[in-house]
Amino acid sequence: MRPSLAALAFSIALSAPALAGPSADLAASALEGRGPAFEQPAQALRAAPAGDQGARFGEGLLLFARAVERYGQAQYRHGLRVPPAGAGFLPFLRMPVPINPSPEPLSYEAQRKTLAAFLDDLGKAKAALATVEGDPKIRFDMNAVTLDFTGDPARRVRLGDLVAQMQMAGRPTRPGAAQPAGPQDWRVAFDRGDALWLQGYCNLLSAGIEFALAHDWSESFGILGRQFYPRAEAAAIPFVTARDGRGMTGADGDIADVVAFIHSIRWPVVEPKRMSAARERLLETIALSRASWKTILAETDDEREWIPSPDQKDAAVTFAPVTPSIVDGWLATLGDFEAALKGDKLVGHWRLTKGFDLSKVFTQPRPFDLVLWASGHAAAPYLADGPTLDSTAWRRWNALLGGGFLGYAIWFN
């Protein structure tokens, strides 16, 4: 029998003197699928005493997991499938959900609502994480975390398998295919530094959603939507779907759609305030990354660290070293990013002799035209004189991070 919300809250209240322990255990149990789904224990943790920092942290973790799960459920419901070649740069359409044999129709307006709901869910997770104080710790096995995308508890997706699939170019596992194996044991001990880190990721994801919702991309959706969602709304054009007498095939049409999609990326601004909000969220991401590192560098323990300091050796992630020079390089890179977002430094363009003011791109937005940005024409209204981050800045960032800038940026946030 599944415990009631009242019972969960009562068990936490009874053990309040133990502070984070029982609440952390409840959060870990929910994350690992050993108890009720994310939402019910998150509500119970919200009802815990104000001083229970394990409850605050656990609620934030569960709300983040629930946000990702709800977004994945929406993608499954509408049959999200393998991104076509050349369209993998669309980050919110790369979630490898199982194939849905009976997808529902999807309109442009419904897709915007899905993104808005994801943004709202991330905001709730971030708000809970922002209340965490002290140094609570939640220990759990990342590979035991499962997400229910299909509505069938028997088909929950393990986080480890999800990560493994995303490493395979975001290709979902088709019916009958073997699941790629994730790590067998991925135990972590999330602490205060990780609470700040996850807040930052909430902001980073939210910035991308704010950018999308700031623009009208309905034409692009109409062109390429069917390649992602089988029943997406599209113009009634009699395209070839199989080989015809001229040798043309449906696959040739897929390539043509990608070309048309790129041409259609000239998105009008429909909600300009969201562009300013995206900039603020990016600045918050930078501030939280700094705060996270300040906390990490002050830690004296050493237990299954998600992001270890140079002095911590028991790391849950071991694909890249964390040395004093790497940390210093990352913090210096954050300074450049912040300067660009504030307009203190300009951003260079391969074709222009001046830099452009990135802050004004957000605060004084114009239609986003991908081709014109690539050619430099779209940067013209924002050109200015001043210190500029050009290609040498990229080389410097990469050198400071041991040649692995992108990997560290994804990990460190």
Feature roles, as predicted:
Residues 6-16:
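Bacterial N-terminal signal peptides
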Residues 22-42, 64-387:
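Short coil/linker segments at helix-helix boundaries
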Residues 399-413:
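Short, low-complexity, Pro/Ser/Thr/Gly-rich segments in the mature regions of secreted, periplasmic
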Residues 51-56:
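Short helix-capping/linker turns of helical repeat alpha-solenoids
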Residues 1-5:
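Positively charged n-region of N-terminal signal peptides that target proteins for export
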Residues 45-50:
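Solenoid-like repeat scaffolds
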Residues 57-59, 91-92:
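Alpha-solenoid helical repeat scaffolds
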